[in-house]
Amino acid sequence: MAGDCYQANGNFIISQMNDKTFKLCHGVAILATDGRPFGHAWIEKGNLVMDFSNGKNKALHKKKYYELGKIPVKGHKVYKYTPKEAAMRMVKTKHWGPWESKPPR
């Protein structure tokens, strides 16, 4: 399972440095095609979720996005970062994430 969700959504969040209402989220979702958990990243702004993974530009209501991905997956927390917090972690770790957990795949 390989995608670019951490990098794609990381790039978006750092483009929003002056807007703390955007949050970069790292968590675990369930892949619809095989029913198995995977590490994932997305953007939240209030009740809107945006996902720029794999060249897409998805926008859904948060409740629907979480429902489709079965988020939060039992035993896995959703971590949320402001643009500044995300940028600081990117610099400190020298990677896009995840930073606080080891996803199942």
Residue ranges and their predicted role:
Residues 1-105:
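A structural boundary/capping signal
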